[in-house]
Amino acid sequence: MKKHIFFAVALAGAVCFAAELFNGKNLDGWVSVADHSATGGYLASEPTWAVVDGAIRTTGTPFGYLRTKRSDFANYRLKFEYRWWRGTEKPNSGVFLRLSADTGTFIPRAYENQLERESVCSVFALGGAVLEGVAPRTPYDPADALSGIAAVPRKVSSSEKAMGEWNLFEVEVNGDSVVNRLNGVELNRVKGLKTMKGAIGLQSEGGAIEFRNIVLEELP
């Protein structure tokens, strides 16, 4: 029987219910979506996603994501640790918020917290998701997964640790806003989210990355 750990967190007079989204043993509760085309760079010799020493590990190929089976997360605080476990010059990944579970493409309709080292904590609207007041780079075309991307870059210096070290990422999603903190430092604050609920996703986008201690506190 699958078990989740639930506990209550008192915060500013409100009680939030928290759950560990990853049990540290297997990928129960998660669904993988991947691009197996040539552009995905699929390496058959290694699994895209695996559990290694209590962490979710991805090789970064093929491109795609691992999402929660639950797809109605609305307002919450999400905390997790991540590290780049195998070095590349510009490792890339991200975490998807309010991801539409009916998206079948390797880039979903969602908001992305960027983890790529040069732009960590930047926020993107993907796959037709809307950030009010932020114009997309190109008009959205459902036939083109890379179209319609809107971005709010991080405007302060990164607080990310060196390659191979664990980082603590905290994101608060509440109403139309998202606030990102990395290792205790607020790096970005964005308003204008129009999608109000969805799944949570971990991205495979070329970077060899690990995630652990993934805890979500739902807000009232």
Where are these regions (language model features)?
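Sec-dependent N-terminal signal peptides
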Residues: 4-13
